[in-house]
């Protein structure tokens, strides 16, 4: 214990093995017998000491909050509050309509999250992030209750993780073709943007063709969302379920379609 320099647990360390992700030898140490909350460190017989670490309730709360706030920082099509986003704050970006590839049809697909390394918005990785966050809500009692992370929707009676996920879901619903039920794969420029701020990327946004990959991922997370959100907003849950069913019908009619490949001069992320 760091507070009083007392030893609270002893044991042997075995099973050392090289971990390429860490770049060093690692071993698992079980100190589940330590029940008192506090700050601790591990000291080896050689005198080597670990970093100090906490034991107690809620030790991952700050990491969880930071993770949700990261998604807020990725929001597209809306102004980011400097009190929340700090250096990442900006005015509303990418507010224009997108053009369906190979046509002159314009479509409103504003909203959603920017992708990891560019300002495109992609259904496939977006759906993966949505599913991970919905599982977090289901598996974590803390996440299921926390409504005070500090996003604009905090305090509305809905867990903040669901508020943040809904921002992406609302965008995904716009990505579904109203007639066929298929889902456009992504909305990006023709090429990756330069190293510029979000509001400075002014390339024409293009909706890449509908894909089974995007449509399948969309159907899955919308079906999941229809269950999770029902206790908070039944009308929204119904919309998610209807969208999932429509996407599923599209997939039944296009079972032989191949995975996604970039078309024309578009070279942004494929997520096939």
Description of each model-found segment:
Residues 101-116, 142-149, 176-203, 251-272:
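Glycine- and aromatic-rich loop/turn segments at beta-sheet edges
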Residues 29-32, 114-124, 151-170, 203-213, ...:
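Aromatic- and glycine-enriched glycan-recognition loops and surfaces
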Residues 1-60:
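Ligand-binding face of N-terminal immunoglobulin V-set domains in extracellular IgSF glycoproteins
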Residues 58-83, 164-180, 241-259:
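Long, well-ordered core segments of solenoidal/helical folds
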Residues 44, 130-153, 170-175, 217-234:
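Well-ordered alpha-helical scaffold segments within catalytic/enzyme domains
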Residues 48-124, 128:
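An acidic-aromatic substrate-binding cleft motif
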Residues 19-22, 49-65, 144-164:
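Acidic/aromatic-lined carbohydrate-recognition and catalytic surfaces
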Residues 155, 159, 199-201, 205-250, ...:
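A conserved hydrophobic secondary-structure block that centers on an alpha-helix together
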């Amino acid at each position: 214990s760091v507070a009083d320099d007392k030893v609270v647990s002893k044991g042997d360390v075995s099973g050392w093995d090289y971990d390429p992700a860490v770049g060093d030898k690692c071993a698992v140490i079980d100190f589940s017998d330590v029940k008192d909350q506090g700050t601790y460190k591990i000291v080896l017989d050689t005198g080597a000491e670990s970093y100090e670490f906490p034991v107690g309730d809620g030790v991952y709360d700050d990491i969880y909050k930071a993770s949700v706030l990261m998604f807020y920082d990725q929001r597209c099509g809306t102004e980011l509050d400097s009190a929340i986003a700090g250096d990442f704050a900006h005015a509303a970006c990418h507010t224009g309509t997108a053009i369906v590839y190979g046509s002159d049809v314009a479509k409103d697909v504003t909203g959603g999250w920017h992708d990891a390394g560019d300002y495109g918005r992609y259904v496939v990785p977006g759906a993966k992030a949505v599913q991970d966050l919905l599982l977090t809500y289901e598996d974590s009692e803390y996440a299921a209750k926390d409504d005070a992370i500090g996003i604009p929707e905090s305090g509305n009676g809905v867990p903040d993780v669901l508020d943040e996920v809904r921002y992406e879901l609302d965008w995904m619903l716009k990505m579904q073709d109203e007639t066929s039920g298929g889902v456009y794969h992504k909305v990006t420029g023709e090429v990756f943007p330069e190293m510029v701020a979000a509001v400075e990327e002014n390339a024409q946004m293009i909706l890449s063709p509908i894909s089974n990959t995007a449509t399948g991922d969309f159907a899955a997370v919308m079906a999941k969302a229809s269950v999770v959100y029902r206790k908070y907003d039944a009308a929204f849950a119904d919309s998610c379920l209807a969208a999932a069913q429509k996407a599923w019908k599209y997939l039944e009619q296009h079972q032989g379609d191949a995975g996604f490949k970039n078309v024309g001069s578009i070279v942004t992320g494929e997520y096939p």
